[in-house]
From Swiss-Prot:
Seems to be involved in p53/TP53 activation and p53/TP53-dependent apoptotic pathways, probably by enhancing acetylation of p53/TP53. Component of a mSin3A-like corepressor complex, which is probably involved in deacetylation of nucleosomal histones. ING2 activity seems to be modulated by binding to phosphoinositides (PtdInsPs). This is Inhibitor of growth protein 2. It holds the Pfam family ING. GO terms for molecular function: chromatin binding; DNA binding; histone deacetylase regulator activity; histone H3K4me3 reader activity; histone reader activity; methylated histone binding; phosphatidylinositol binding; protein-containing complex binding. A zinc finger (PHD-type) spans 212-261. There is a cross-link at residue 195 (Glycyl lysine isopeptide (Lys-Gly) (interchain with G-Cter in SUMO1)). Residues 48-120 form a coiled coil. One of its GO terms (biological process) is spermatogenesis. One of its GO terms (cellular component) is CCAAT-binding factor complex. The lineage of its organism: Eukaryota, Metazoa, Chordata, Craniata, Vertebrata. The gene is ING2. It comes from the Eukaryota. Zn(2+) 2 binds at residues 228, 233, 255, 258. Induction: Induced by the DNA-damaging agents etoposide and neocarzinostatin. The keyword Transcription regulation applies.
Length: 280
């Protein structure tokens, strides 16, 4: 009885091994066919693309020649005929450009289809345990809760201040309107104005009562904030709108409570108190 079971197991293993070998052989054959035929198909498309490009260059030269004749021609009838030639040449150049785009699209689809075909065939040899692990990982990734949008508690470290300055600097660069087109510049200005209005009148959020408060307004952190460079500042962080800032200033910056004559200098009395504490 035991011998029959062993023979059945051996037979099943042999069948599985034979089936796997057959699938592997088929995969290798299909792979070789795809790899061998792909260069020929690509070369044919490249040759067609080169021919279209030559015709396109000839058409552009024809357009230049006709346009030069048109500028020098004084006869109205002759100018009208040249206009028709110029129009036909422009239409021809557009058609050639469309054909070139179509050929390039065909080349891209050809490569993608071959790669997709090989990937589909390779799944036959994937380890079942590995497939199960990949499936479980995908389920875990999809079931993870979304990250909280609440700003983390700020700490009094130079590293956190630098990171805040870097983030504000990047956002400030995005807010500056580019000098390309008037329409884009107007849209940028509208978005920047709307952003400033949102910062001036923040929306009521579900606030944690234990969350720390900052700024002169004694509210929680939101939007863009800047840190006072006075290490002894009791408030430390300020909203841009509360201190009349639209972008992060260069160099050091002191809050209204710690500054001296201007926002770049510290109050002398505050600086003196700081030195006295160090001497103690």
């Amino acid at each position: 009885m035991l011998g029959q079971q062993q023979q059945q197991l051996y037979s099943s293993a042999a069948l599985l091994t034979g089936e796997r070998s057959r699938l592997l052989t088929c995969y290798v054959q299909d792979y070789l066919e795809c790899v061998e035929s792909l260069p020929h198909d690509m070369q044919r498309n490249v040759s067609v693309l080169r021919e279209l490009d030559n015709k396109y260059q000839e058409t552009l030269k024809e357009i230049d020649d006709v346009y030069e004749k048109y500028k020098k021609e004084d006869d109205l009838n002759q100018k009208k005929r040249l206009q028709q030639l110029l129009q036909r040449a422009l239409i021809n150049s557009q058609e050639l450009g469309d054909e070139k785009i179509q050929i390039v699209t065909q080349m891209l689809e050809l490569v993608e289809n071959r790669a997709r075909q090989m990937e589909l065939h390779s799944q036959c040899f994937q380890d079942p345990a590995e497939s199960e692990r990949a499936s479980d990982k995908a389920k875990m990734d999809s079931s993870q809760p979304e990250r909280s949008s609440r700003r983390p508690r700020r700490q009094r470290t130079s590293e956190s201040r630098d990171l805040c300055h870097m983030a504000n600097g990047i956002e400030d660069c995005d807010d500056q309107p580019p000098k390309e087109k008037k329409s884009k510049s107007a849209k940028k200005k509208k978005r920047s104005k709307a952003k400033q209005e949102r910062e001036a009148s923040p929306v009521e959020f579900a606030i944690d009562p234990n969350e720390p408060t900052y700024c002169l307004c004694n509210q929680v952190s939101y939007g863009e904030m800047i840190g006072c460079d006075n290490e002894q500042c009791p408030i430390e962080w300020f909203h841009f709108s509360c201190v009349s800032l639209t972008y992060k200033p260069k160099g050091k910056w002191y809050c209204p409570k710690c500054r001296g004559d201007n926002e770049k200098t510290m109050d002398k009395s505050t600086e003196k108190t700081k030195k006295d504490r160090r001497s103690r």
